[in-house]
């Protein structure tokens, strides 16, 4: 009997040590320290603008147990402002998204995560793009699972925030090689485009418009430091704006 008790105690101690060893603290993209168990997650929910897109680059969509309504094209009642915009991750995986539970409405007009809807999906981790530390901490407390915040940054896939988000996801889901491959591929493509366009002398002046800013916009929404133009050595006609990033200009300036 004593031997059995000793064996049982040793087994429990071993299991506890294994779980402890598997856990690690990571720092998400808004500086929050979160304890995770890398490679252990089987049920994933992505919330907030950009979270599902970034996860789709690197994570398995088969692990998703819920999506926000904006990404479920089978729903009649949902935000539709991006239906006319090409969203590669929806084109690639949209049929799978339609089979998943609702994790909330989503979209640019939703500023708070819907905890009850997320709980109904029963995730063991949440990937978020809501960049409010207090709200993210509160949501994590409500859900009882890690809530990891990503950031894409103003320059999209060419942004340091995007690259670091890929590295973070790679660590959490134990796909570090894939994260490195994605970042390396994007950097190589940017370098190749720069190389091909560097010696172009006859450059037409170009205006970019309709840039997203918490939803769809019009011809007056532009940027003077549009990253794709910078990489491709394009002559951007927009100059002299007070700040960087996507912003509206006056009709007079457009004309």
Could you say what each language-model-derived stretch is?
Residues 1-10:
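Bacterial N-terminal signal peptides that target proteins for export
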Residues 9-18:
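Bacterial N-terminal signal peptides
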Residues 19-57, 177-208:
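Bacterial Sec-exported substrate-binding components of ABC uptake systems
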Residues 29-31, 100-114, 153, 241-252:
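Short helix-initiation/N-cap motifs at beta->coil->alpha
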Residues 41, 105-110, 114-131, 251-255:
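Proline-aspartate-enriched helix->loop->beta-strand connector
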Residues 52-117, 125, 237:
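A short, structured surface patch at a secondary-structure boundary
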Residues 135-214, 235-240, 246-248:
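Extracytoplasmic substrate-binding proteins
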Residues 218-245:
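Alpha-helical, coiled-coil/dimerization segments enriched in small aliphatic residues
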């Amino acid at each position: 009997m004593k031997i059995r008790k000793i064996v049982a105690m040793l087994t429990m101690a071993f299991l506890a040590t294994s779980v402890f060893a598997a856990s690690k603290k990571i720092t998400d993209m808004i500086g929050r320290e979160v304890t995770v168990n890398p490679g252990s997650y089987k049920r994933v929910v992505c919330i907030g603008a950009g979270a599902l897109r970034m996860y789709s680059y690197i994570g398995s969509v088969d692990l998703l147990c819920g999506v926000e309504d904006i990404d479920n094209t089978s729903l009649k009642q949902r935000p539709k402002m991006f239906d006319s915009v090409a969203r590669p991750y929806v084109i690639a995986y949209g049929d799978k998204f339609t089979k998943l539970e609702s994790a909330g409405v989503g979209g640019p007009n939703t500023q708070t995560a819907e905890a009850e809807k997320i709980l109904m999906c029963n995730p063991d981790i949440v990937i978020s793009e809501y960049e409010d530390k207090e709200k993210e901490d509160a949501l994590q407390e409500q859900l009882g699972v890690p809530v990891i915040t990503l950031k894409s940054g103003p320059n999209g896939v060419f942004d340091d925030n995007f690259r670091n988000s890929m590295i973070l996801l790679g660590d959490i889901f134990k796909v570090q090689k894939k994260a490195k491959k994605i970042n390396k591929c994007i950097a190589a493509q940017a370098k190749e485009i720069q190389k091909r366009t560097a010696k172009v002398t006859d450059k037409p002046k170009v205006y970019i418009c309709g840039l997203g800013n918490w939803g769809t916009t019009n011809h007056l929404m532009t940027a003077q430091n549009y990253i794709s133009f910078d990489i491709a050595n394009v002559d951007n006609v927009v100059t002299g704006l007070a700040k960087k990033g996507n912003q509206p200009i006056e009709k007079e300036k457009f004309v």
